[in-house]
């Protein structure tokens, strides 16, 4: 097994980490940053930009620049959270044939998995550039409160990116691993991980125990909201700016896609600035224009105003904290440490509310942007077998069950059950001579199945005729270490059985995944071709510049035929540069270098002759004799202006 990288696939930013021995290393991307914006832009010429380069061009290409796509992964188009995003996002969210929420870009429908795969591919390449070897395996993190469909979709995104996802791990659990591994405190410690990221919120209560020299991380409970995060905070600021601008100037910016993209950038910047200062100015010249001319936006935003705008959002994080404490069977006073994860936890008001609830200051020795990726890398090392002193016991965040008579949700596995786990229960038919049963699998906490999320359904057919209640049908649930569910149904009388991995009514089919992998490989090949073309083009342009300059300066040393040959080769290469044929450009560059060889030889000979002449002149000056007497030092007698000295460099201050 090779190196397993740890990837934090975030809503706003992503991060990649590896283990070097027992030390974790967060890897800088090609721009030198330790985190990469989770933004993907699709250019007109087919080029795909990921990260900072995509973010930079977002203002001029808002409809084809995708951000916060993690909020759509594994979701149905009809879900209320998705419907809410449709009105807010500059890009077009559409319904796929299977009912999932997809995105339309330049007339092509893309799944959230494909877009996420572009981000994962960038993280994969970041690791490969650092390690100098191919990377094929990863541990990817997800919010603890992600349901089965969202976990499966994240795994599929990894496959499309060319990664074998060895484990899906919960973000708060990963952060706890990063925090707890180097702590020397003895005895059991209970920690709360409060994770408020760009698009999701999680809280987990985790017990770290020392068991015979092994660190055991046991998740006692988890709770959260997969549609609450920094993006919502940004939106509150954007809405405020729009309403203030409308009051002052009578212009509504809410339907101006270009203006909205600039407002998004400004809101994010203002939010970050207000974590360190009491007020900030938002200045956006030429934000829009009407018949009277251009309009400029200038608004002062104070920290107090920001806090009043987002107070209700921060308040929404407290109910899950309360529930997590209750489900863990502990009290707030039992919590030893509170760890903050996610960029939003830098906001003073968030820290204040967390302190108020838990009754203690949160720890400051955890990097909120990097801890999750670091924890994923640690888990990767555990999976390779290199690390044997860590045991991770995670839980399923939501109850799982099936629909039974009357539409009731019969729970098979309750929330916060340690995984992996198995459970089986026997059911029977509802009607006489019923030939088949449909098993509908749901996830959620509501008493009626219709109030929960339908994960999938399948049939068990060929049940022999019998009175209702007689057939014995065993339904088994099996959750693997990734939190992904496998369900089976077996007729005990006939031995007939049927099994599925839950992904039937949602997500991508195997054919779609394979097609997307092929598309990604084609894109990678295309990217390689483009890079090679750019490199050849750069060499050619440098050759044209160099030869043209040398010809102008030293062309008089050549005869007319040689000059004409070089000029013709330059012209041929310039023509080739107008096209996209890499081989033609390379050939013409080689031809130009061959044609200009004579020029190079003449320049070299001229340079050698000049150096020889210089040496001869210097020798004559030092020879003494008829040219004038000199003393023993070689200094002409009576010349007081010539001084013997050691030469040393003097640095200018």
UniProtKB/Swiss-Prot annotation:
Bias type Low complexity, positions: 607-620, 629-640
Ranges where the record places region Disordered: 607-653
An MF annotation (GO) of this entry: unfolded protein binding
Signal sequence, renumbered to the chain: none
Gene3D superfamilies: 1.20.1270.10, 3.30.420.40, Actin, Chain A, domain 4, Substrate Binding Domain Of DNAk, Chain A, domain 1
PROSITE patterns assigned: HSP70_1 (PS00297), HSP70_2 (PS00329), HSP70_3 (PS01036)
Phosphothreonine: modified positions: 200
SUPFAM superfamilies in alphabetical order: Actin-like ATPase domain, Heat shock protein 70kD (HSP70), C-terminal subdomain, Heat shock protein 70kD (HSP70), peptide-binding domain
Keyword ATP-binding: yes
HAMAP family, per the entry: DnaK
PANTHER family, per database record: HEAT SHOCK PROTEIN 70KDA (PTHR19375)
Family: Belongs to the heat shock protein 70 family.
Function: Acts as a chaperone.
Record protein name field: Chaperone protein DnaK
Lineage of the species this protein comes from: Bacteria, Pseudomonadati, Pseudomonadota, Betaproteobacteria, Burkholderiales
Gene name of the record: dnaK
């Amino acid at each position: 097994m090779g190196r397993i990288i740890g990837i934090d696939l975030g809503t706003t930013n992503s991060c990649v980490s590896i283990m070097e021995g027992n030390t974790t290393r967060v890897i800088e991307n090609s721009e030198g940053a330790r985190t990469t914006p989770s933004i993907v832009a699709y250019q007109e010429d087919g080029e795909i930009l990921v990260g900072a380069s995509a973010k930079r061009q977002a203002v001029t290409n808002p409809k084809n620049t995708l951000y916060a796509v993690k909020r759509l992964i594994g979701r149905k188009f009809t879900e209320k959270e998705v419907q809410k995003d449709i009105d807010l996002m500059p890009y077009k969210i559409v319904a796929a044939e299977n009912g999932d929420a997809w995105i339309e870009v330049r007339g092509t429908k893309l799944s959230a998995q494909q877009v996420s795969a572009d981000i994962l591919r960038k993280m994969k390449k970041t690791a490969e550039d650092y390690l100098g070897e191919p990377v094929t395996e990863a541990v990817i993190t997800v919010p603890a409160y992600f349901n089965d469909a969202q976990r499966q979709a994240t795994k599929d995104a990894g496959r499309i990116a060319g990664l074998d996802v060895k484990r899906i791990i919960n973000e708060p659990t990963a952060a706890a691993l990063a925090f707890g591994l180097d702590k020397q405190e003895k005895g059991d410690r209970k920690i709360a991980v409060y994770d408020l990221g760009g698009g999701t919120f999680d809280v987990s209560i985790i017990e770290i125990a020392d068991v015979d020299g092994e660190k055991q991380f046991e998740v006692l409970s988890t709770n959260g909201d997969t549609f609450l995060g920094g993006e919502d905070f940004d939106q509150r600021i954007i809405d405020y700016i729009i309403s203030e601008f409308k009051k002052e100037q009578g212009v509504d910016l809410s339907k101006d896609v270009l203006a909205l993209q600039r407002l998004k950038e400004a809101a994010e910047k203002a939010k970050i600035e207000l974590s360190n200062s009491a007020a900030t100015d938002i200045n956006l010249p030429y934000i829009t224009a009407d018949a009277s001319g251009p309009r400029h936006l200038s608004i002062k935003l104070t920290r107090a105003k920001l806090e009043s705008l987002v107070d209700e959002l921060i308040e929404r994080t407290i109910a899950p904290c309360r529930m997590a404490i209750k489900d863990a069977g502990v009290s707030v006073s039992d919590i030893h440490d509170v760890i903050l994860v996610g960029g939003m936890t830098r906001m003073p008001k968030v820290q204040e509310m967390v302190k108020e609830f838990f009754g203690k200051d949160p720890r400051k020795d955890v990097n909120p942007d990097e801890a999750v990726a670091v924890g994923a890398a640690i888990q990767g090392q555990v999976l390779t077998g290199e690390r044997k002193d860590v045991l991770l016991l995670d839980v399923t965040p939501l109850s799982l069950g099936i629909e039974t008579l009357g539409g009731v949700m019969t729970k098979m596995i309750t929330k916060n059950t340690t995984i992996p786990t198995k459970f089986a229960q026997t059911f029977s038919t509802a009607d006489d001579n019923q030939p088949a049963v449909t098993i509908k699998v749901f996830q959620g906490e509501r008493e009626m199945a219709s109030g929960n999320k339908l994960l999938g359904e399948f049939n068990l057919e060929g049940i022999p005729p019998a009175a209702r209640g007689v057939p014995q049908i065993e339904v088994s649930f099996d959750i693997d270490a990734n939190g992904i569910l496998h369900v089976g149904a077996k007729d005990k009388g006939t031995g007939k059985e049927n099994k599925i991995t839950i992904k039937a009514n949602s997500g991508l089919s195997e054919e779609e995944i394979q097609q997307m992998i092929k598309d990604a490989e084609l894109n990678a090949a295309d990217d390689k071709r483009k890079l090679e073309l750019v490199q050849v083009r750069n060499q050619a342009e440098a050759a044209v510049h160099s030869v043209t300059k040398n010809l102008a300066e030293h062309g008089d040393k050549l005869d007319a035929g040689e000059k004409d040959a070089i000029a013709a080769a330059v012209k041929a290469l310039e023509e080739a540069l107008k096209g996209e044929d890499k081989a033609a450009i390379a050939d013409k560059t080689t031809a130009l270098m061959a044609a200009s060889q004579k020029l190079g030889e003449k320049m070299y000979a001229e340079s050698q002759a000049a150096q020889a002449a210089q040496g001869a002149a210097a020798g004559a000056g030092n020879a003494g004799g008829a040219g004038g007497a000199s003393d023993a030092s070689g200094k002409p007698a009576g010349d007081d202006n010539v001084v013997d000295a050691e030469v040393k460099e003097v640095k200018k201050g």
